[in-house]
A protein has these predicted regions:
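Short, flexible helix/strand-to-coil boundary loops that buttress conserved ligand/catalytic motifs
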Residues: 25, 70-71, 80-83
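N-terminal/domain-start segments enriched in small and hydrophobic, helix-friendly residues
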Residues: 2-8, 14, 23-27
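Glycine-rich beta-strand-turn "strand-cap" elements at beta-sheet edges
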Residues: 1-5, 41-53, 78-98
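Generic structural motif
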Residues: 14-16, 97
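Short, well-ordered beta-strand segments in beta-rich or mixed alpha/beta enzyme
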Residues: 4-12, 42-71
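Short amphipathic alpha-helical segments
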Residues: 17-41, 75-78
Length: 98
């Protein structure tokens, strides 16, 4: 059995930019494109009720290899551009499960 990979990414948006960032991801179809990728088991964003600029992304992949392919897609290139525009900081955590 392959090891699944779960990633937790804590984004801190630039002040007042959280909603704009999420709106761009949605209207440009980036979230839907990621969810349709081979190997993507789960991909969703959660909002902090305590910090108006904080976002938590949780994503799960069938394998680390499929997640690495995901990072090389055109929509991920666009996501990186949007992060440069709207995000002040991002912290990544990984969990591998057999």
């Amino acid at each position: 059995m392959e090891t699944t990979l779960t990633l937790y990414v804590r984004y801190l948006a630039k002040p007042g930019c959280r909603e704009s960032f999420l709106r761009q991801l949605t209207t440009e179809g980036i979230i839907d494109a990621i969810r349709r990728e081979d190997g993507c088991l789960w991909y969703d964003y959660f909002l902090s009720v305590q910090n108006a600029d904080e976002i938590l992304l949780v994503e799960q992949w069938e394998s680390e290899e499929k997640q690495q392919v995901h990072l090389r897609t055109a929509h991920m290139d666009r996501l990186r551009e949007l992060k440069a525009q709207y995000v002040a900081d991002a912290r990544l955590g990984k969990v591998r499960l057999d």
